[in-house]
């Protein structure tokens, strides 16, 4: 039986990676990670949230460079059937999403909104694994650009999360905040910056999403998936240099996150992170926003439940939670 709302807000947060490889490899290859992940999912289900805010990234499936938002709040959304993702329509409570957008604008954030938001595994993976399905709970999806230059400042991501948390605290509900992505990894060979690639077809797709040029969304996905299958073989064999994490960077981030809080990264320089931890490490913006939101909504201690640099999923495997 679901818990009855007491009218008093309470908050929960979890942050985990969303890399597709974790969904196609046998779970016993990464048993420690999955044990920690499933324990966190069980904890979330016991919390039984009445509302979920999920902070996720996109991999040129829903957002393209013809008009790339820095932040976006989905008022309606569906997840595509991409590699490592789980398709379906998200149960977005439009009235709450709209009220959240209004609150955020009053907080002086000029966010984008979408009534037809398309999300990929960057959102659907965490919803599926944490809650059982992408539509298991009412959810407001928050896109944070972590892939395309220029990315938002870490301070701004924290401030956005803080504002969303203050909005959520006023709802009188049990609210979960999920951060999807990270930690250290590099995907620049797969997702280059548009001004760095000489491949005209790829450049057109990054900008137009298949509306112009030789790459259709179907062909893009087919070719991307084929490449990822080959990379996955190398990762499962633990080929040196393939999918290598940066444990020194990860451990520094997690140590500061738990000891200093989300404000510790306000002055971080994006170029330095790209150099030392890879362009995928920028997805910790989603973690910072989610944990800032949870903190503003009443969560306290941030805890690292699991970390492993040597997994074969292509990123450092970590599970972080706050409540």
Residue ranges and their predicted role:
Residues 60-64, 184-189, 194-195:
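Short catalytic/ligand-binding loop motif for oxyanion handling, primarily in non-cytosolic enzymes
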Residues 1-49, 65-159, 170, 192-323:
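Flexible, D/E/H-enriched segments
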Residues 18-20, 55-59:
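Short glycine-rich, polar/acidic loop-and-turn segments at beta strand-coil junctions
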Residues 161-166:
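Internal active-site segments that recognize and position negatively charged phosphoryl groups
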Residues 50-56, 142, 173-183, 290:
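Beta-strand elements within well-structured catalytic alpha/beta cores of enzymes
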């Amino acid at each position: 039986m679901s818990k009855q709302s007491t009218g008093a807000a309470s908050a929960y947060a979890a942050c985990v990676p969303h890399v597709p490889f974790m969904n196609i490899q046998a779970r016993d290859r990464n048993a420690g990670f999955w044990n920690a992940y499933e324990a966190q999912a069980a904890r979330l289900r016991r919390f039984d949230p009445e509302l979920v805010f999920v902070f996720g990234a996109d991999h040129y499936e829903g957002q393209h460079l013809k008009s790339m938002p820095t932040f976006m709040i989905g008022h309606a959304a569906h997840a595509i059937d991409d590699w490592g993702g789980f398709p379906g329509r998200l149960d977005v409570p439009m009235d709450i999403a709209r009220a959240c957008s209004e609150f955020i604008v009053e907080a002086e954030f000029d966010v984008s909104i979408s009534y037809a938001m398309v999300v990929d595994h960057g959102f659907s993976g965490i919803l599926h694994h944490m809650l059982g399905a992408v539509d298991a709970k009412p959810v407001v999806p928050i896109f944070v650009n972590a892939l395309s230059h220029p990315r938002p400042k870490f301070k701004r991501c924290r401030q956005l999360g803080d504002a969303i948390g203050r909005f959520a605290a006023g709802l009188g509900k049990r609210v979960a905040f999920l951060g999807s992505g990270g930690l250290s990894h590099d995907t620049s060979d797969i997702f280059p910056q548009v001004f760095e690639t000489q491949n005209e077809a790829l450049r057109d797709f990054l900008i137009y999403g298949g509306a112009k040029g030789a790459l259709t969304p179907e062909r893009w996905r087919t070719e991307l998936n084929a490449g990822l299958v080959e990379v996955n073989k190398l990762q499962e064999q633990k080929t040196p240099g393939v999918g290598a994490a940066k444990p020194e960077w990860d451990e520094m981030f997690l140590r500061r996150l738990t000891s200093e809080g989300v404000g510790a990264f306000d002055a971080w320089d994006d170029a330095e992170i790209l150099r030392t931890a890879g362009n995928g490490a920028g997805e910790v913006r989603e973690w910072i926003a989610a944990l800032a939101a949870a903190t503003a909504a009443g969560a306290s201690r941030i805890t690292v439940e699991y970390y492993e640099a040597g997994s074969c999923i292509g990123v450092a495997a970590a599970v972080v939670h706050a409540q």
